[in-house]
Amino acid sequence: MAPPQSQKQRSRNGCLPCRKRRKKCDEQLPQVLGLYLSLSEQLEPVPVDLSPAEANDNSSSSDSCDSILPAHLAVTGPHHSGIWPSAERAHSTYYGAQGLALLESVASHSHRSLPSIDKHIGAEEFARWDYARIYGPTVTWIPYNTGLSNDFDPDDAMPLIKQSIALLGDTKEPVFVEVENFYLAFFARYYYDYASITDLIIYRARERFATSDCLKQGMLSTAVLFRANYENSGLTAPLRDHARELHSLAVKTLQVDLDNHTVSPWVKLSGVMELVNHDYYAGNLATYYHHLSQAASLVKMVLHSNNIDLLNLAGEHTFDIRLFAWCDIMGGMALSRPTLANYESDIPDPSVHRMVGEHHAHPDKGVEWIFGCPDVLAVLLARTTGLRHASVSSEEKATRGKEIERLVRESQFGLVRAKTSIMRAARLAAQELWRHAAILYLHHAIFKSERNHSGVQDSVKQIIKIAGTLKVGVNPDCFLSVPYFIAGFFATSPKHRHTLRSRVLSCGNERFLRHLAQALDELWNESDANGGLTSWAGNHPPKFIF
C-alpha cells in the first residue's frame, strides 16, 4: 500500500494552500525554473529564424562563437560544481562548452538574485544561446579521459603510436612534438581506419614533415586547427589565429616552391595537398578549390596522364595522388562540374566475381582507409559525375545510369577490420550509408528523380535507420557528413530533415559542417517555395565542400 502523501510536499501543479482550498492554482513558476524549461526545450535543435545575410555572417565568422558568454556572466556560484563535471563527461552535445557555460552562469546568477535575472538575460543573450547551439562546437573531444577511451580510441591503437614515438626517439625538429600530440589526440578523427597505419604513421609523418618547409607549416597549421576546434579551452582564439598564421606562411612558401624548377613535382604536389587538407578542415571555400586546381596540374605532371586508376594505384608514394582523387571526386559532386581528372578502373561484375578472403582497406592503396567510402563506390561516384556531363542523349544516360546503379547495389566491399564487434558493425553500417548515398546521387545527377520517388525515399529512410545505430560524433560517424547531406537534400518530412541536419552538425566542430547545414536550410526553403526539386550546386562562389 502506498504511503499517504505528505501534507508538506509541494504539489506538482500548484502550491499547498491552493490544493487545500480545492481551487485552480494560478501560481507562477519561479523564474529560474521557467528559464530552465525554456532552455531545455532546445535540447532537440530547431531551425533558428536567421535571414540569409545573418546566417552567412554567422557561418563565415570563425571566431564569433569564442565570445558567446557575456563578460558580466561570470562562471561562479554554488551550481559550478554540478554542471561542469557532467559537461566534461559528455563527449558529444548539442550545446558545446560555450553554451553550457552560459547555462551555468544563468543558474548561478539566478540562485543569487532572482529579481534581477531579467536584467541579465534578455533577447540578445537568448539569441547568443541559439547561435551557440547551431554554430558553436557540437563535439567535446576529451581524449585523455579514460572513461571515454572506447570513443576516442575504439581500436586501442594509441599505445602503439606512443611506442613508435619512443622507439624513434627524439626528432631533430622539436616542434614536431605538436604533430605527435595531434595524432595521439585526434588520430581517430583524422583517418577512418586509423589502426591500419598505427605502426607507420609517426615515421611517415616525420619524413613528410622534413621534406619541405611548406609541408612542415601545413602540417602544423592543421594540428593547431584541430586543437582550436576541439579543445574548448580559453586558448581557442589564440590557437585559431596561430593556425591562420601558419597557413598563410605555408601558402607563401608553396608559391616559392612552385616557382622553383629544382623542386620535385612530387614535393610540390605534397605541399599543395597539405594546404587542400587544411582548407577542408578550416572551411576555406575559395582557397580549397583553388589549391585543388593547382594539384590537378601537378598530378597530371607526375603521372604523365590525366587518367587515374584508383583501384590499382598503389604505393606509399601515391598517397597525395589518392588524396587528390578523393577531393576531386567530392568536388565534382558538390559543384556539379566534371572532375579535374578522369577515373578509369575496371570494376568486375559482382554477379560473376565474388570476393574471397580478407581484403581490408590498405594504407598504400585506395582511399577507404582515409575517408571510409569503399574504393569501388568512389570510382562509381566519379563515373556518375562523368556520365552527368557526357555529351550523350538522355536515353543513353538513363541506360548507363541503370548499369551504374546495378553495380552500386550489387558490389561487395572489402571486409572491415576492427578490434570489437561493435566497431565492425559500425564500419559495415558506414559502407551501407555510402552505398545509399551513391544511389541517391544517381537519382540526382542522372535520373533527375523527384523527392517522392519510391527508390529515393527508400534510401533516405535506410540512411536514417542505419545512422541511428551509430554513436554520434565519433569514428566512423564523423566521416559521414556527405551521406547525411545527400539524404537530407531528398528528405521531405520535417522530422527526417531535422534528424539529418542534426547528424551533419554532430559530425564535428569544423566550419564546413556548418556550411552544409546552412546549405540544407536554403535548399529546403527554395524547393518548398518553388514546389519542386532544385540542384544543390551552381552557386558562385561555392557555398560548401563535400
Annotate each language-model stretch with its function:
Residues 2-267, 281-483, 487-546:
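Intrinsically disordered, low-complexity activation-like regions
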Residues 275:
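Aromatic-lined, polymer-binding surfaces characteristic
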